[in-house]
Amino acid sequence: MGRVKPKYIKSLAEKLLETYPDRFTDSFEENKKAVAELAEIPSKTVRNKVAGYITRLIKRRKAQEKAETAA
């Protein structure tokens, strides 16, 4: 089991994903760069957690879409 992410990381990631849906992919490295450009996050750790959560959300959405089309 993984760790639970804090609410501020989840809310920031969801807000960025709603505002800039075309800027993010399922690649953590690309998302990390995009988060650094779009949000002023002074901490590298927080930036990486936000980018990781965005990556996870995108992968989850793609898997869900794939499952819906297969069914």
UniProtKB/Swiss-Prot annotation:
UniProt keyword list: Ribonucleoprotein, Ribosomal protein
BP terms from Gene Ontology: translation
Superkingdom, taxonomy of origin: Archaea
UniProt keyword annotation of Ribonucleoprotein present: yes
Recorded coiled-coil stretches: none
GO cellular component: cytosol; ribonucleoprotein complex; ribosome
Classification via HAMAP family: Ribosomal_eS17
Family annotation (NCBIfam families): PRK01151.1
The protein's name: Small ribosomal subunit protein eS17
Name of the gene: rps17e
